[in-house]
Amino acid sequence: MKAVILLSGGLDSSTILYKAKADGCECHAISFDYQQRHRQELQSALTVAKKAAIAKHQVVNFDLRQWGGSALTDDAIDLPQQRSLDEMSQNIPVTYVPARNTIFLSFALGYAEAIAAERVYIGVNALDYSGYPDCRPDYIEAMQEVFRLGTKQGREGQPIKIVAPLINLKKTEIIQLGNELGVPWELTWSCYAGNDVACGVCDSCRLRLAAFAELGLVDPLVYA
């Protein structure tokens, strides 16, 4: 079974890559260089894909800095730092990139239909503190309908399936799953700051570090 995997190089997407492999899929990973602040994740995506020895990995290039609207695509917007988990849960953060998962899933859908893949794996999870609107179950359900209505395969009764195995998992549970699957955490990248070493203070770093600490584990990634 062929599957397209949305691979950022982060903790979640690396876990779903290994999950797709465990599911017996022939994995075709796709990553995006959209001129994001944290482009270091692309090197992690390349390294993780190589380590996993998948069928194919490619990077799609486009520039979302032309639009801005996010701390990840506009350097004039400061990254939140040193926020507590409670503070992160108050509202949609400035690190939300407008419609990013819709853009990514559209590319993944086109790629999947072109290579006759049956599945698209995405690492969204609705229980993270950063409550992005395009990481929620109702969004995935709506996009599944787009997959059904917007493709030849879908209209012929064989829609490409969106697989979101992390959708109801907490970060600690994702790490536990990744450990079972053998995900190489030391190769992954979560930091938003755009430095050569993970900052340890942005929301993404803090969520990751807190989850490892809650499990009594040491995060193998090096932090500043």
Swiss-Prot record:
Membrane-traversing stretches: none
Record key words, sorted: ATP-binding, Ligase, Metal-binding, Nucleotide-binding, Queuosine biosynthesis, Zinc
Positions contributing to ATP binding: 7-17
Residues binding Zn(2+), per UniProt: 191, 199, 202, 205
Gene3D superfamilies named among the record's database cross-references: HUPs
SUPFAM superfamilies in UniProt: Adenine nucleotide alpha hydrolases-like
Name recorded for this polypeptide: 7-cyano-7-deazaguanine synthase
Species this chain originates from: Nostoc punctiforme (strain ATCC 29133 / PCC 73102)
Gene, per the UniProt record: queC
